[in-house]
């Protein structure tokens, strides 16, 4: 069974502790894809929900001291119930505080994967690239950045940009699909973190396969959305992207995938 079919069959509960700007978009995107999102932010509630969850997303976009404590509590509970947790270290290269939080979560808690743009992941491993907060483009060595992070942290890494790279156990693949409209809609990267959290726990020992499918589904859905009437406009693209996540099939992935 393909990873996409498995996701739709299991409809995993995915707990999303994400930033305030993107909660609605993230929830709708996961529902369209076939997962079951919950945007819980209270430790006692997390204790109840994570027992049944298939994944946890920690997105540090809306960062406060209290949220830092929440991330820590959620990761402790996730480890207790063996729930795979994905970290999206939003803008961790933009300042010392964000970097400190990201380093703490990576070094002191169990993570199943890290998803970030080239600038974010590069900052975690001490590689200099040109980036601006949550935006990163035109990076040529994205596969090297992914491999460096995978080697340093010994967990799967997803690095996004004009080309995306996935590194698992020292092996790297690059994804050459995607839409230029994605950076023009706030929250597309954050939703991707939740999609990664939806796929990462589907098949133990098959993380590279699951992550490759997650990236292909996401990026090809973006291509489909851009090709639709007025898909070149951000407002229309946002709606059509959700529609494409709902409609995309394994046949679409097989026909349009560009992987190296």
Curated annotation (Swiss-Prot):
Its cofactor is Mg(2+). It is an enzyme of class 2 (transferase). GO terms for biological process: thiamine biosynthetic process; thiamine diphosphate biosynthetic process. SUPFAM superfamilies: Ribokinase-like. InterPro entries: Hyethyz_kinase, Ribokinase-like. Substrate binds at residues 39, 187. ATP binds at residues 115, 160. It catalyses: 5-(2-hydroxyethyl)-4-methylthiazole + ATP = 4-methyl-5-(2-phosphooxyethyl)-thiazole + ADP + H(+). GO terms for molecular function: ATP binding; hydroxyethylthiazole kinase activity; magnesium ion binding. The keyword ATP-binding applies. Keywords: ATP-binding, Kinase, Magnesium, Metal-binding, Nucleotide-binding, Thiamine biosynthesis, Transferase. Pathway: Cofactor biosynthesis; thiamine diphosphate biosynthesis; 4-methyl-5-(2-phosphoethyl)-thiazole from 5-(2-hydroxyethyl)-4-methylthiazole: step 1/1. Pfam families: HK (PF02110). Its EC number is 2.7.1.50. Belongs to the Thz kinase family. Catalyzes the phosphorylation of the hydroxyl group of 4-methyl-5-beta-hydroxyethylthiazole (THZ). This is Hydroxyethylthiazole kinase 1. It comes from Streptococcus pneumoniae serotype 19F (strain G54). The gene is thiM1.
């Amino acid at each position: 069974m393909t990873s996409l079919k498995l996701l739709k069959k299991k409809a995993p509960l995915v707990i999303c502790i994400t930033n305030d700007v993107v909660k609605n978009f993230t929830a709708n995107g996961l529902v369209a894809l076939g997962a079951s999102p919950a945007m819980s932010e209270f430790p006692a509630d997390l204790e109840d929900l994570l027992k049944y969850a298939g994944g946890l997303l920690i997105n540090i976009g809306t960062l406060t001291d209290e949220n830092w404590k929440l991330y820590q509590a959620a990761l402790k509970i996730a480890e207790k119930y063996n729930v795979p947790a994905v970290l999206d270290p939003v803008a961790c290269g933009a300042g010392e505080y964000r970097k400190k939080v990201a380093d703490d979560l990576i070094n002191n808690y169990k993570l199943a994967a890290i998803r970030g743009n080239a600038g974010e992941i590069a900052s975690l491993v001490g590689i200099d690239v040109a980036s601006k907060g949550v935006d990163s483009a035109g990076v040529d060595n994205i596969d090297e950045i992914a491999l460096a992070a995978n080697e340093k942290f010994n967990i799967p890494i997803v690095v996004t940009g004009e080309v995306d790279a996935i590194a698992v156990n020292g092996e790297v693949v690059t994804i050459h699909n995607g839409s230029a409209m994605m950076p023009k809609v706030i929250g597309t990267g954050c939703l991707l973190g939740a999609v990664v959290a939806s796929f990462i726990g589907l098949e133990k020992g098959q993380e590279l396969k699951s992550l490759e499918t997650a990236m292909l589904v996401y990026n090809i859905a973006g291509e489909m959305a851009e090709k639709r009437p007025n898909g070149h406009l951000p407002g229309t693209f946002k709606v059509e992207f959700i529609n494409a996540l709902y409609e995309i099939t394994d046949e679409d992935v097989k026909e349009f995938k560009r992987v190296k």
